[in-house]
Every structure is written in C-alpha cells, then in structure tokens.
Amino acid sequence: MNTKISNTIKFLSADMVQKANSGHPGAPMGLSDIMSVLMKFIKHNPKNPKWLNRDRLVFSGGHASALVYSYLYLSGYDLSLDDLKNFRQLHSRTPGHPEITTNGVEIATGPLGQGIANAVGFALASKYAANLLNDEKTKVIDHKVYCFCGDGDLEEGISYEACALAGFHKLDNLVIIYDSNNITIEGSTNLAWNEDVKARFEAQGFEVARIDGHDFTQIEFALSEAKNKTKPYLIIANTKIAKGALELENTSKSHGAPLGEELIQRAKKEAGFDPDKHFFVSEDVLFQTRAAVEKGDLEEALWKKSLESLTSEKKELLNSLLNPDFSKVEYPDFSGQKLATRDSNGKIINAISKAVPSFLGGSADLAPSNKTTLNDAGTFPDGKNIHFGIREHAMAAINNAIARYGLFVPFSATFFIFSDYLKNSARMAALMKLKHFFIFTHDSI
C-alpha cells in the first residue's frame, strides 16, 4: 500500500503542476515515498487543525507545495480535489507557496532556510510549554516537530544559526528530514557545495541517520527511531528528484517546470495507473489515508479527557496562555522623566511580562544594551528570557514559529542596523500578521 499511496501523491502533484502550467513537480515526486510513510507517524486531527498537542509538520521548501496539498487532501483536511485542480490560481486555497489561510498549513516558510528555523521555533515553544504545563500525571504537551528540507535550505546561513541553537538545547522533539537529491536549479550541487552534512550536524549536537529515501523499510525504521532520541534528529534521505518521471528523473529540468502531459501519461502507465485519468485517487488509498481523521479525533478526545486531572493552577495558566490579556498590564508613568527610549521600553516590556504569562523573548546577545531582559522571569527553557546568541536571522524566524505555536507572544531585539540580517523573517511575520514584536535600538532611533 505504501507504493500505491506514494504513486498517488506523485501523480496528484504532477497533475497539479501540469494543469497550472507552472510549479515544482520534482521535490513532491522525490519525497512521496517518505511522505507515504510519515503519514502513519504524524499525530494530528484533520477535523481540528488547531489542536494544541498535534505534531507540527513544516515544509521548509515551500516550492514543494503540491506535496503539501496532496498530503492535506489525502489526510482529510478541509481541502477538495477541486482545490487541487485550482493549484496556483488567483484566490485559490492552494497557492504556489503554502499560506496559513489553508487549513493544515502550520507556517508560511518563504525563502529557503526559513522553515528550518521555524521548526526549531516550534520545538523550542513545545519544550517551554511542556515545562510550564506538564506534571507527573498529565502530558499537556508531548508532540514532535517534523521538518522537510532540501539542499538549498542547508546551504542558507539561517540553517546553521538555527540548528546550532537546536543542538545546544538538545531539542529531542525535533526531526529534520533532509531531501538529499544533489540537484539545484543550475544543476548538480557539486557546482558550489561539497559539505559533509552528517559531520556538520553531529558537530552541532544532532543524532544523524542516513537512509535510502525510496526504501520503505529504511524510512519506517528511521522514523520509528525518532521517539528514542535524546537530541535533535536529522534523517539524511538520499533521494532522486522527480522519482518516477522516467527520463526527467534525477535531472534539474524536473525542478521547476511541468513535466509535460505525454511524459506524465507514460509515467502513470509505467506505475500501473490509468494514463488518461487526472487527479485520480482510488478508494482503497483514500480509506487508508483518511483513517487519520478518526484516529486524530480519538487522540484529541483522550487528550482533552486527560486535562481534567490538571490542578486548578495549571488550568488557569493554560487558559491565560491561550487567551493573553494585555488589558491587565500596569504600564509605568514616565511623566517628568527623561529616559532613553530603550530604557522606557525596557520598563514597559517588564510590566507586560509581569501581567501576561505568554509574553517572552530575547535579544541576539544584546539584551543589556537593548534593555530587554525580563527581570525575575528566568532563562529558557525554564523561563521567559531566550538567549539566541549572535543569530539575528534565526532569532526572528524562530520567534515567528513561537508566535504561530498558539500559546506565546514573543519579541525579537537587536540594534536597528542589524535588522538587515533578519528582514526576510520580519517580512514573513508581516505577511502572516503574527503577534511578534520587533525591538530595535540605537542607530539614530
């Protein structure tokens, strides 16, 4: 059945790109084998995409959106075949790069590398939430964060920043699946990259496995091992871009252009599919994949039942995290005072922190200068002050995910001139309309 589900994902993706006459078929087809297995591991409820204790699935390469939409449709999210047929069309629910307006999309990842830092942010948020809410009897938060990434993501500098922080904090709830197909737009990755990725991630504090990304047994074993890790986990999956696309398989030509109707028909025939049927999903495949709906509904119901055993203090804290109330903040009065704006802002954010449990954040190693230390609030993962190190870009993207997590309102702080290092992340925060505060000081502000 894995093969049949995988081929269904392949040809849904190819059909979407072909009908739109634009898009990226290569990555979805190369990752379909892994996706068909991962679907069995993910804890989620398609009927309630906002269930707090769901696993988070991040697609750092947003161009592989056809894979995202195939997964969401097959799993039973509020997405129809007609939506898939409207791929990349104006005002459709299936835009070229996934947006958070589509149910089941955790975060809009934007430029390459953002999604890796977003995944680290989700994992950090999860760890802090677990420390706040879990007790010996009840695991309010115990989910995983999965992230698909590719060669391009790992070449981007933000991935180094974010993964170094993930390794430092031993984020054992983070699983990164690296689609290692050695292909970029210009050709082979050998044109500009020969890094030992395994050694790099081990040096950053990850556990690393290397698998054949088209061997179902190896995929299943690697994913099952994720539950036993004490560190973040990188799965290097050696894959072929556009697997199953005949002569375009394993070529850069399959990355960002339709495969052509004639080739798709031949590929379908080769795989035992009817070459004349488009957007075809067999009943047995849908029966298998839509089991996620009933399973997820039951898992969430059991989770809700378990919350009844929480203490009244924990229940109150959970409610305040879910519903931050800034009206309770007692803002300081600066009448008659001459203060630098960073000093007055420091007093304001401390007033917010005392009244709003969900408010947290940090600076890129400039908290004493930015005046952004939250007094008497502790240090992450047990407190609100997050030490990001000198990692502006990762900081902002990590906080984007913390803002999307559902429990926290973060801030990112640095000197104004260093905003250049995080503009892509700030742009994504604006596009998603996130509750993410950016604090910039010095440099004539």
Predicted regions, residues:
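Conserved acidic/glycine
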Residues: 1-31, 35, 148-149, 153-157, ...
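Short coil/turn connectors at secondary-structure junctions
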Residues: 52-55, 63, 78-82, 101-103, ...
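Glycine-rich beta-alpha junction loops
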Residues: 64, 181-182, 238-242, 443-444
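Thiamine diphosphate
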Residues: 108-111, 116-229, 233, 427, ...
